[in-house]
Every structure is written in structure tokens, then in C-alpha cells.
Amino acid sequence: MATKFPKFSQGLAQDPTTRRIWFGIATAHDFESHDGITEESLYQKIFASHFGQLAIIFLWTSGNLFHVAWQGNFEQWTKDPLHVRPIAHAIWDPHFGQPAVEAFTRGGASNPVNIAYSGVYQWWYTIGLRTNNDLYTGALFLLIVSAVALFAGWLHLQPKFQPSLSWFKNAESRLNHHLSGLFGVSSLAWTGHLVHVAIPESRGQHVGWDNFLSVLPHPQGLGPFFTGSWGVYAQNPDSTSHLFNTSEGAGTAILTFLGGFHPQTQSLWLTDIAHHHLAIAVLFIIAGHMYRTNFGIGHSMKEILDSHVPPAGGLGAGHKGLYDTVNNSLHFQLGLALASLGVVTSLVAQHMYSLPPYAFLAQDFTTQAALYTHHQYIAGFIMTGAFAHGAIFFVRDYDPELNKDNVLARMLEHKEAIISHLSWASLFLGFHTLGLYVHNDVMQAFGTPEKQILIEPVFAQWIQSAHGKALYGFDVLLSSANSPASSASQSIWLPGWLDAINNNTNSLFLTIGPGDFLVHHAIALGLHTTTLILVKGALDARGSKLMPDKKDFGYAFPCDGPGRGGTCDISAWDAFYLAVFWMLNTIGWVTFYWHWKHLTLWQGNVAQFNESSTYLMGWLRDYLWLNSSQLINGYNPFGMNSLSVWAWMFLFGHLVWATGFMFLISWRGYWQELIETLAWAHERTPLANLVRWKDKPVALSIVQARLVGLAHFSVGYVLTYAAFLIASTSGKFG
């Protein structure tokens, strides 16, 4: 008899119902639960799968390069980045009639194409790529790297090349190699690329495989480096009249600290970026020599953690026991990694628009909007994942004996205080913010807008002033010419920075008022409530007063039967599931705020945001409704336009989103009855009844149906907003 899917679980493979398929898919990546798994083979499988992940990433990025080189207009775009629309790839669609062909033939192409809103054109241009040939070379190189990664994954599954468990648990070696090798050396290599290729190209000096060994990145070569006169490398930077990609106004400096933006490209100075990466490289290469391995010198992580005991004893055993807890729990490590990565991804979203690193990105409004929204949503999913794996750690890996009275144990012991404080903060934020919004709505509705409660964000304005924003008239720190902070840096980076922060053409420290104050607190409500649900889920994952033995039921369970009322919806998984809805809504508010504020800035009518953002009807009417008009007009009696694809996606996104509720609101019995009726009809329908099934059809479990509902809700939500964002921005600005 052929072995049925799933091979990793004999119990499931013998299940006579369709549960076999769905549970098989659901647990395919839960290696810990598979038959015959050992700790060592678990680590080895995960390690090998990382190479597969890398292979996919390199294949994907190779595809981006290849399609732009083949079907894009990169060379034309580099000659006039502000007026040529970058093409992502061609569209071949047999459904296209003549009006569709005409609508999508743009960007100088002779056939229908998609416009690129990913920022890759700006990135490739900034780092020194100039021709289609450069793109093809990059695509081929990444294809080779992808093949190497795939081979490495296969190789590390072979018995002779499988690392041992002790190798995976050698924390010091891993820290050293990741800090020095991964971050340090790669930052150094990137500095090298910027200095040797990107900066010369930005000054009109071609550097390629043919001449990179003979072109000096600096007129004095390595002389100043070896003689210690490093300041030479910062002398003679590009002038403010420099034209990117030409020698006009170009300097010779390679490592600078100018501050602010290149006036023409509105992006950070390339020489500042190179300097930053060099500094990062030095720091991380040093950091990667700190931990004790072969030579008996340096820090031991275990010793560091064990000695972290607060002296007075009031805080218990401190970090004792944490080394083994972290080092023996993959879920703990993954939780930490996801928490860090989530924060970093959100920071990328913030910095990509406020300090644009790529030439001419700041003038491509749709791309800026797309990149901000993309990175914020991804950050949300990653951050919720951190708490999910934190909760799984508490259920599967936490050892109370090993962590007696340390910080982890103490967190669990005073969880009621933590959860109730978070709850109070969420309630306070929610009621006060909603109260202000609704009051303002009523005042607008009754025709007395002057009776709105409008609060100036004075503390935030003070912080902006401290960073040098002069508009508010606070005479403090960098906004005061006489402060030590100002005088200390006057000749170095400050002139460029002060010019940038007080210039209204960029998004650095935007002017804020009462509308910003309100939406800031609405976002704070969302963040605190999402955190409350996630933290409660993790802290109650092992047990609660209501259900002390919760950990014995695992991470995800629907209920403990009818005998124990109130045990439904309280698994750690349920907390994660609820939190994702809050996360999505919160990031909805974040992206609405960012987008509307920027639309009004870019259009020069910032008064619209300032006046309409202080009450809810303003958001609904002047942001959502007003900006969806282009979408609703994608198809009309006069034919179609290039926004029609977004109009269709907007409708389809709503459909996917609404489908989610079908799974979220109806429970298992309804589906079971429906399936049995459909199966009955199938068996009695001629022709159809020639097709039989081996597995008895049964409804999804409660937990699975929730997952399917959540997946539809999330995908539909993001898809709908993506269509709205891109259509409403590109409809205005091209």
C-alpha cells in the first residue's frame, strides 16, 4: 500500500477523513511534532531549509533584474529619472481589447506594461548600475548564487555534512561569526562598493569590470590611509550644485559628514552613506571578537547572564538560568529574532521616506507611499509572530525549575499587574481619543466647528525644535544658535541638517498640529491594545486562574469540552488570532495617516489635512471617499483607463476580505451539515457520481476555520488598501 500524505505522521496518514489533508498541511512545518524527530535532526532540518529560503530570495531578485533588463526602460529612465515612468515588466494578456492595449501602453513602451512602484530603479541607479547589461550581469550572478544556496541546502542534509547539535548550540561562535562576518564584513564590502563604484558613477566616471582595478576612487589613493591623515578623504565634497551622474559640481571626497540631502536628488549624500557603513563595519568587526571561543579570552554569555543579579536582592535571581533557557529553545530564539526584525522593518518604513537614501526616490510619490505601507504591514506580521513564538516557548520549552525566581519567572508571577496596567492604558487611550473625535464630529455636524477641542502637540513640537526645527519658535538645543549643541557641530554636519529639517520640500520632521495629536493617540490605542492581547496570550499560555492546566492542552486548542464551561477562545493561539485583527486595524490607521498627510503636502493643500483630520467624518469623507473616486472610475461608460486594474483589485480585495467573515462567524456544525448535504447531492448526480473520494469529507476544526478566516481577512484587507493607495496616488501624480 502506498504511504499516504503526510509521511511525517503515521497517525494522521491513517485518518480516514479529509482532516488528514488539512492537519497535514497545518503541521508540515511543525517539525517538533513529527514522527521520529530528534533534537539534532530538528536543528539540521531547519538549518538546511534556510538555504532553500535563500535560494528562493536570490531567484526572485534575479527575476526582478532580468525582467527589467528584458522588458523595462532602465537606460531611458537613467537619462531623465524625473519624467520617464519606470517599467517593471510587459503585460501579455489575451483578454486585452484595443482600449486596454492603449491604456496600458505607457512609459515610452510600444506594448502594454506595468509601471514599477517598488523603488528598484532608484536603488540600482544610486548604487552605480547604468545599462541593461549591468542588470543582466546582476541577474546571472544572483542565479548562480541561488544555485549555490540550493546545493548547500542539499549538502547539509547529507550525513557527512550535517552539523552536530553542539555546533548549533555554540552561542559564542555564532555571535562572533554573525557580528563580524555577517554584519561587519558585509558592511565593509558595501562601503567598498559605494566608494569604488557608486560614488564615481554618481560623478559621471564609469566604473565596470573592465576598469575597476585601474580607477582610483580618490586622487590620493591609499596614501592618506597609511599616513593617518584620514581627514583628506572628507575634503572637497560634492557641491550643492552637483548634477547627479555628471562631473558638474562634483568633488573628490569619499567619506563625509555633510548632513542633509543632495539638493537635486533629494536623497542622502552618497559619501555620508559610505561613511556610515564604514563606521558600522568597524563597530561590528570589533564586536565579533568579543566572545570566548578557542583561545579562552573574551566574554562567556553564560557567565555574563549568571552575574546579572541585582545587588539588593529585591529583584530576585536576575538573569540566572536564562542562558540555557534561550540556548535550548528555538521558539525563544525565533521570538527574539522576530521582535528585532519587526522593529527594524518598521524603522525601514519610517526612514525610507524621512531620510530617502536613493536618488530621486523623494520625487516618486507613489513609490514612497507603496514602500512605506509595504514595510509597515510586514513589520506588523513579524511583530505579532514574535509573541506567537514567545507563547509557544512558554507552552513547550519553559522549565520552571531552571528559571526559579529569575526575570522570566517573575514576569509570570506578576502577570496580573502587567496585564491590568496595559488594559488600563488601552481603555484610557481609547475612550479619551474616541471622545475627542466624536465631540468634534458633533460640533461639525451642528455647524459650530469653532467649538471643537483642538489640542496642540506641544511636547512633540518641543522635541522637533530640539532637533533644529525653527518653525514653532522654541529656542532650545539645535533650534537655538547659542546652545552648546549648535556651536559644537556648526562646522561639521549641522548646516546640511538644519537646512534639511527646515525645508518644506522633504518629509523630515513634518509640521504637526491637533489632527496629528489625535491620530497619534488613536495609533497609540491600537498599539497598546494589540500588545495587551499578545502579552496576555503569552503570559497566560501556561495557565490562568480559570484554567490552571492550560499548558497540557498545547498552544492551540478550541475548548476543553462541554464539561468545563468558559475554556473556549483562551488558548495562546486564540490571543494571537485576535491580535492580528488589531494589528491590521492599527497599521490601517498608521498608513491612512501617513498617506493623507503626504497627499496634502505633495498637492500643496496641507490645510485640508489640518482641518479635516480632527473629526471622524473628515477622515471618511475627505480621505477615504474623496480618494477612492479614481478607483470607482476605473471602468466607466466611455471605456477604461490604466487605473482599471486597480479598480478591479479594489473590488476583488473587498470580496476576499468579506469571504473571511463567512469562516469567522459560522461555526463547525453549520459546515458539517452543509458538507453532508453536498456529498449526498454529489452521490446522486449523474456523471458527477463517477468521481469518488477516498477520504470522508468533514468540516475544518474550529481553529483551522479561524485560520482560514483570518487569512482571507488579512489578504483582502491588504489587497484592498494596496489598490486604493497606488491608484489614488498615481492617479494624481503619475
Swiss-Prot record:
Chlorophyll a B1 binds at H654. P700 is a chlorophyll a/chlorophyll a' dimer, A0 is one or more chlorophyll a, A1 is one or both phylloquinones and FX is a shared 4Fe-4S iron-sulfur center. [4Fe-4S] cluster binds at C559, C568. InterPro entries: PSI_PsaA/B (IPR001280), PSI_PsaA/B_CS (IPR020586), PSI_PsaA/B_sf (IPR036408), PSI_PsaB (IPR006244). Its main location: plastid. The keyword 4Fe-4S applies. Phylloquinone binds at W671. PsaA and PsaB bind P700, the primary electron donor of photosystem I (PSI), as well as the electron acceptors A0, A1 and FX. PSI is a plastocyanin-ferredoxin oxidoreductase, converting photonic excitation into a charge separation, which transfers an electron from the donor P700 chlorophyll pair to the spectroscopically characterized acceptors A0, A1, FX, FA and FB in turn. Oxidized P700 is reduced on the lumenal side of the thylakoid membrane by plastocyanin. Belongs to the PsaA/PsaB family. This is Photosystem I P700 chlorophyll a apoprotein A2.
